[in-house]
């Protein structure tokens, strides 16, 4: 109980009773390097309250064992060989104390004893070499199996992530998913090392204990082994406490790293708002929590090590004393005493190793449970080729789209309907502009059409087929070219970003190069790449940060055009461009649209974007309140459109 109170975040109970409560005042409590200046900050208290709402670490259950066996099964040949090597090395180690006892008994036996010692010394040397070779084989086989398991796990886990619906990423933090892809899978794959250590320790402990029973008179066994039982029980209880504190420290460290990753990813926003000091205070607040948990972990770990070192030393003295008594009484020989002492030490250390391996296996199963939470709920999606084969209609014809009584709410906000009974008909080849206030649901229409979300009610018809019911979302996406208001580029060259949506088959590379060249020229990407030293091979940087906002948007437009889509979706696509670039892109898009004969959906706030549209739909509170030819709508605007024009919200 004293140790439990000492490890608690509130501190020891005995200190709480001291005059003036020295623990809470900070006199006896270890001072954090940040506490003195953070406790006065409101952000610090917010961080403290946030840390209390910690997510519990998934407890390992027996349900994870079948999945663990499924992961290990492809490596069963390696594991069988590793188990054989483990048994060989354990046999060598267990025979060593017996041979050493025989050698000691032959000391002082004259010429015959000397020959015996020489022969058995050579035999012991050969056994040591054989044991080392067996250990090498065991570790090599296990380590290679670990790498193969980690490879498959990461491959399956990443596949499961990229196939999850977008709503999953709205409800889960990217940092946590990346941590599972890295640390949790690494810890899960290390279960083989822990299991082999546990098996080896169990074999050594069991055989060592049996040898002790054989060497020691029965009336002395209880007195010799009773300290082992006491050390074992105490070590198990204390070890659980240490693991719980270590898990708390890891969780708080993960929170700090996640915050740092998020803020460094948005460093431009931090710098724009001069928020460096604010972020430093917030990060130091989280580090303070890590420090407190780390101090508790250090104290508990040091106590556990002290316990085992002290207990092991006392146990060794206990063995020496009892062996001395037995030798003096003539019960056993000196050689038998040496063997007995070595077996006792091996059994004691093996029990300790088994406890440590058991705790590590529990951690591995806990990490495995986190990974299985994703793998076990991964959606099975049909291959794109099957969807394309099932689709009908000419590949070159524009898409016809119809929204029929569509309602939708985001999974993260189920209480707020974004679309309510929306009806919208986009004929094949039409160029429809969607107007509306911010938050009216304009961009949600594009997200639903791209299949990133499924409507909660209603149907979306594409070329006369129910996109959701007939599972044509993947095929529909292959027919779309989407340019969003937030351009997203990857950390690769501009050319690779433009050809991202094209076939990766090397056979199509020549055709891809031609499409990239034409799309880059149409989107005016070549206007700025021609002046760069590496041209289209220039790296875009992480998230495209090496390019300006307008340049990123033009690359995104080229990426959409390179697919020769049957429908183009512009969601504020030119909002990041200056007037000159916007005019040039509009002219290029007008040429592309007239030559490609594709449908077009334009979500915009700018009147200039309406010049190449022939239909206008006005969206208000998640529903289309006016729809028709552009000239008719602008000449007879509804109340919602009048309000938009009056407030100059274009």
State where each predicted segment sits.
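Transmembrane helices of ABC transporter permease
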Residues: 81-87, 197-248, 321-332
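Cytosolic ends of transmembrane helices, especially the final helix of ABC transmembrane type-1 domains
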Residues: 252, 272-275, 299, 347-376
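Juxtamembrane loop-to-helix connectors within ABC transporter transmembrane domains
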Residues: 72, 142, 146, 160-207, ...
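ABC-type nucleotide-binding domain
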Residues: 392-650
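Hydrophobic alpha-helical transmembrane segments of ABC transporter permease domains
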Residues: 96, 134, 146, 182-226, ...
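Hydrophobic alpha-helical segments in the permease module
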Residues: 124-135, 227-230, 301-316, 334-356, ...
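Membrane-integrated ABC transporters
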Residues: 1-96, 106-124, 138-142, 146, ...
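Loop segments that connect adjacent transmembrane helices in multi-pass transporters
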Residues: 172-175, 245-296
């Amino acid at each position: 109980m004293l140790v439990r109170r000492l490890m608690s975040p509130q501190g020891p109970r005995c200190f709480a009773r001291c005059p003036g409560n020295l623990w809470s005042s900070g006199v006896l409590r270890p001072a954090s390097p940040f506490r003195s200046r953070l406790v006065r900050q409101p952000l610090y208290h917010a961080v403290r309250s946030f840390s209390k709402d910690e997510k519990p670490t998934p407890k390992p259950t027996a349900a994870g064992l079948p999945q663990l066996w499924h992961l290990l099964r492809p490596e069963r040949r390696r594991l069988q060989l590793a188990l054989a090597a483990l048994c060989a090395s354990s046999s060598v180690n267990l025979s060593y104390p017996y041979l050493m006892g025989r050698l000691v008994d032959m000391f002082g036996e004259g010429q015959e004893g000397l020959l015996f010692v020489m022969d058995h010394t050579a035999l012991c040397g050969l056994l040591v070499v054989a044991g080392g070779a067996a250990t090498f084989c065991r570790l090599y086989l296990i380590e290679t199996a670990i790498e193969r398991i980690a490879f498959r796990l990461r491959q399956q886990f990443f596949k499961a992530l990229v196939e999850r619906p977008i709503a999953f990423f709205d409800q889960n933090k990217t940092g946590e998913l990346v941590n599972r892809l890295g640390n949790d899978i690494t810890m899960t794959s290390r279960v083989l090392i822990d299991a082999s250590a546990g098996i080896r320790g169990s074999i050594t402990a069991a055989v060592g204990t049996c040898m002790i029973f054989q060497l020691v008179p029965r009336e002395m066994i209880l007195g010799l082994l009773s300290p082992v039982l006491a050390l074992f029980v105490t070590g198990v209880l204390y070890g659980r406490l240490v693991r719980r504190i270590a898990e708390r420290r890891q969780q708080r460290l993960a929170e700090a790293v996640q915050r740092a990753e998020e803020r460094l990813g948005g460093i431009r926003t931090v710098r724009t708002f001069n928020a460096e000091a604010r972020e430093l205070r917030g990060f130091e607040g989280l580090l303070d929590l890590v420090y407190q948990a780390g101090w508790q972990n250090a104290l508990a770990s040091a106590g556990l090590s002290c316990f085992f070192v002290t207990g092991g030393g006392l146990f060794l003295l206990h063995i020496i004393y009892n062996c001395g008594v037995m030798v003096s009484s003539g019960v056993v020989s000196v050689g038998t005493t040496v063997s007995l002492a070595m077996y006792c030490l091996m059994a004691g250390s093996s029990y300790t190793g088994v406890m440590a391996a058991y705790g590590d296996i529990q951690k591995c199963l806990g990490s495995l449970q986190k990974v299985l939470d994703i793998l076990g709920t991964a959606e099975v999606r049909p291959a794109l080729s099957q969807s394309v084969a099932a689709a009908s209609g000419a590949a070159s014809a524009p898409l016809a789209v119809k929204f029929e009584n569509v309602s939708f709410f985001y999974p993260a906000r189920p209480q707020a309907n974004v679309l309510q009974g929306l009806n919208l008909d986009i004929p094949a080849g039409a160029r429809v502009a969607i107007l509306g206030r911010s938050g009216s649901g304009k961009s949600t229409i594009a997200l639903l059409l791209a299949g990133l979300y499924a409507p909660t009610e209603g149907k979306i018809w594409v070329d006369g087929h129910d996109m959701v019911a007939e599972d044509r979302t993947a095929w529909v996406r292959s027919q779309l070219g989407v340019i969003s208001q937030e351009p997203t580029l990857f950390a690769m060259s501009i050319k690779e970003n433009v050809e991202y949506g094209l076939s990766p088959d090397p056979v199509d590379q020549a055709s891809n190069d031609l499409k990239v060249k034409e799309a880059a020229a149409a989107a005016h990407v070549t206007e700025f790449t021609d002046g760069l030293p590496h041209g289209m091979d220039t790296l875009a940087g992480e998230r495209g940060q090496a390019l300006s906002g307008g340049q990123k948007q033009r690359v995104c437009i080229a990426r959409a055009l390179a697919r020769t889509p049957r429908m183009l979706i512009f969601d504020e696509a030119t909002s990041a461009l200056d007037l000159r670039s916007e005019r040039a892109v509009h002219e290029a898009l007008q040429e592309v649209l007239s030559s490609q004969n594709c449908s077009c959906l334009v979500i915009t706030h700018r009147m200039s974007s309406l010049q190449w549209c022939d239909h206008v739909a006005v969206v208000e509170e998640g529903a289309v309140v006016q729809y028709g030819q552009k000239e008719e709508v602008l000449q007879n605007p509804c109340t919602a459109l009048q309000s938009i024009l009056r407030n100059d919200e274009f």
